[in-house]
Structure formats: structure tokens, C-alpha cells
Amino acid sequence: MLVILALAFLVAVGVGYAVVRDPGPGEAGTTPTARPTPLSEVDVSDRRVPRGPFCAALEQDAIEAALSGPVTRTEHYDSGDRARLASGLTDIAHEYNCGYFAATGAQARAWVFAAPVTRTAALALAREGAGTGCRQLSDAPGFGSPSAASVCRVRPGSATAVTLRGLFGSSWLSCQVSALRGAGTADLVRRAERWCVQVATTVGSRP
């Protein structure tokens, strides 16, 4: 099942490399504030994310901040639904996905695998997550443990996507913000970090 889900991601962004972060037990961050905050200023690795529907819990302000505009369309699906998992790939989903779209073409997504993921499997998923047209975020903060982050050209010359993914307990959570050509990469990275912080802190709970 994990192979199928990993393949769906690879179809979307190609084949390449990602940064894998496996923080030691001594690492710690500061307490998140109520406002969306860059990941570098918070510690979300100890969150426990449920493997179930969560779109209703996400805050509208955070979604619109990630899109840099209002939501014009949504694309949600649950595990067991037949859904478009990637461009040209429609199949039975084994994940819970929340997708939001703006009129500008910007997209914000968050999804969690329905099946539990072991630490060994998570390390493998983190290493294989990016693709051709991607580059690693060498200074990316941790998002779960282990975690990975990448910037990819989803459609060469037309869109860029920033994706963070990681293991929270036994849940493999991913989040992504993408925008059409013309959006600054640094701004897109900041928006993705804030979006991921919001998803993890809203959906996840402390043990």
C-alpha cells in the first residue's frame, strides 16, 4: 500500500531527491502561538495526528493565507474513495486528503495515509519523496520525525510546489502549497511552512 501511495506522489512530481531530517531526542522548539508561525519557531514533531477525515478542522484564514487569496474550489476525498491521486492517475485512495484551489491557480493540500507507518518505512518514504525538477530544502526545519522537504516544478515552466512531509506517531502527514509561474520561491516556502504548522497544530494533539 505504501508503494502505491509513494508512486502516486512520484507521478505528480517525478523522480529525484529530498532532504531527510531525523531529529535526535534532545532537540526541542518553542511553543506555537495562535497565529500561523514559521516552522523554525515551533516544535510540531511531538504531535499525534489521527488517520481520518480532518478537513472540517482546518481554519479558513490559514487556508486563504496559504493560497494568498480566497478559495474558489475544493477537492477532498477519504480513504476508500475513487479519486484523482495525481495528473493522469485515478484510483482508490488510501489516504485522507484536503485540497483547496484559488482563482490564481494556487493550491494548498494536506493529506495523511490511512494505514499506520513504521519508522523504517517513514525513512524510506522521506528519501524517495521528491523527483525530477526538484531540489532539496537544505535548511528546512523538521516536520515530524523523520521528515523531508522539497521544492519542485510540478509542470516544468508553469508551476512550483513546496512539500513538507513527516511521521507523527504512526501517521505519515504531508502538506503542500503550489503556485503558477511568477510566484517567488522564498514567499512560497514561507507560505508552505506556515500552512504546515497550522495543519499539524490544528489536527494533531500532544501526547
What are these regions (language model features)?
Residues 22-207:
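A small/polar (G/S/T-enriched), proline-flanked helix-loop surface module common
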Residues 1-30:
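Hydrophobic single-pass membrane-targeting/anchoring helices
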